[in-house]
Amino acid sequence: MNDLKFTTCGDYVNDQQTIQRIGFACKYMHPDQTQKKKILEEIQRPLNTRSTTVQWLNRQTREVAEQRLWDIMVHNIQAYYNLIEYVGSLPNELRMVRLGSDVLPVYTQRDWSYFWQLPDVRNYCATHFARVGTLARSLDVRLSMHPGQFTVLASDNPDIVDRSIEEFEYHTDVIRYMGYGRQFQDFKCNVHISGRQGPAGIKATLKRLSPEARNTITIENDENKWGIADSLELADDLALVLDVHH
């Protein structure tokens, strides 16, 4: 199975049987990578998200920049849909995918975060992300997200914790739009323990997260400092993810 990047596996209970699933991460790659680059791009583009940069946006007029963000939003939400539709066509044990984090670019960036709160934008997201969530549930595709390495919920720097919470809640907004976060672990949003305060810092930060964020957060052992034993200190507070490579 080379058409999606391999990421992880997990167990779930179905009809009183434990079934393993193998999942994929973020980016679709066609099985035949020997084709011409242009052909591959045309095949892969509809299933993969696009992005932009603050630097590019800042060089444009407000009208041009907002139109770019709108176009990216429309493309990316549809790309989510297309990717999940593809994963949903695979055998049951392969129906799991980690969604990319850049679906709504510059969401937490100070100069551009306002765009994502505009009524028309919020209405579009609510309507079309809902389609994505409905599709995933109808095809029994398990979904997850993984905020980047700069999301450090256990930092000893209050500013970093504040920004990390903003970033995690951005992911939660996407999750909420898709109709998840209503029940404990109906979606996985995974972060490393990372940060000098370790498990104690995670416990303190949990209290500041929205209910949907607390329902979906999972904590993974870190490759640098906080291992499996440290993760287990959080077992009564949230769900844990074991990374055997760390």
Language-model segments: residues:
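Alpha/beta catalytic barrel-like cores
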Residues: 1-142, 151-162, 173, 177-180, ...
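A cross-family glycoside hydrolase active-site/sugar-binding cleft signature
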Residues: 25-27, 98-100, 144-148, 190-192, ...
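Structured loop/turn residues at beta-strand edges in well-structured enzyme cores
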Residues: 92, 184, 236
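Active-site groove signature of glycoside hydrolases
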Residues: 147-149, 153, 178-196
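Residues lining hydrophobic/aromatic ligand-binding pockets adjacent to catalytic sites
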Residues: 161-165, 186, 193-195, 220
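Hydrophobic, well-ordered secondary-structure segments
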Residues: 165-172, 202-206
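Acidic/histidine-rich catalytic cores of soluble enzymes
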Residues: 193-246
